[in-house]
Swiss-Prot record:
One of its GO terms (biological process) is translation. Belongs to the universal ribosomal protein uL5 family. This is one of the proteins that bind and probably mediate the attachment of the 5S RNA into the large ribosomal subunit, where it forms part of the central protuberance. In the 70S ribosome it contacts protein S13 of the 30S subunit (bridge B1b), connecting the 2 subunits; this bridge is implicated in subunit movement. Contacts the P site tRNA; the 5S rRNA and some of its associated proteins might help stabilize positioning of ribosome-bound tRNAs. The keyword Nucleus does not apply. Signal peptide: none annotated. This is Large ribosomal subunit protein uL5. Keywords: Ribonucleoprotein, Ribosomal protein, RNA-binding, rRNA-binding, tRNA-binding. GO terms for cellular component: cytosolic large ribosomal subunit. PROSITE patterns: RIBOSOMAL_L5. Part of the 50S ribosomal subunit; part of the 5S rRNA/L5/L18/L25 subcomplex. Contacts the 5S rRNA and the P site tRNA. Forms a bridge to the 30S subunit in the 70S ribosome. GO terms for molecular function: RNA binding; rRNA binding; structural constituent of ribosome; tRNA binding. Pfam families: Ribosomal_L5, Ribosomal_L5_C. It comes from the Bacteria.
Length: 185
């Protein structure tokens, strides 16, 4: 367990959000209420094909941000145009579940996203049709765990929030209640 106390966002979900969602969609069963399954944070490092030391920086940044050691993503097949060989490391990803997932989501929503310059909100169109939401961040500096003086280069990342929602409307409602700042369409 990452912490001894229940994460703030998890408590809010159990006490407030679950009830609101049950009323909003009039679910018969408690198990129908959408919830979070996992959060996958992916950092693609295409330049690592030319310089293998770049992957170490991505691993260090992801470990610092998520508190978990990332898995290295390797190329599945060789592509000559990209100077890529099969099995070469080209990225890193972390799958967060349980309390670590709730803590990471809380830090992302309350600390990291407000630190983005000219932030107007997340696009409400990036749902996949099954209630899961993916968004990208252009740099890792917005997380306060990263020391700005120690970064070797800016790296973006993709964050996928996997939910138990069956469609986009349920997923959007869940994430809005959790505090995702969606742009008004």
């Amino acid at each position: 367990m990452a912490t001894t106390t229940t994460p703030r966002l998890k408590t809010k979900y159990r006490e407030e959000i679950a009830g609101k969602l049950r009323e909003e969609f009039s679910y018969e069963n408690v198990m129908q209420i959408p919830g979070l399954v996992k959060i996958v944070v992916n950092m693609g490092v295409g330049d690592a094909a030319r310089d293998s030391k770049l992957i170490e920086g991505a691993i260090r940044d992801l470990t610092t941000i998520t508190g978990q050691k990332p898995a290295v993503t390797k190329a599945r097949k060789s592509i000559a145009q990209f100077k890529l060989r099969e099995g070469q490391p080209i990225g890193a990803h972390v799958t967060l579940r349980g309390d670590r997932m709730w803590e990471f989501l809380d830090r992302t929503l309350s600390l990291a996203l407000p630190r983005i310059r000219d932030f107007r909100g997340l696009s409400p169109k990036q749902f996949d049709g099954r209630g899961n939401y993916t968004f990208g961040l252009t740099e890792q500096v917005m997380f306060h765990e990263i020391d700005q003086d120690k970064i070797d280069r800016t790296r973006g990342m993709d964050i996928t929030v996997v939910t138990t929602a069956t469609n986009d409307a349920e997923g959007r409602a869940l994430l809005r209640h959790l505090g995702f700042p969606f742009k008004e369409a």
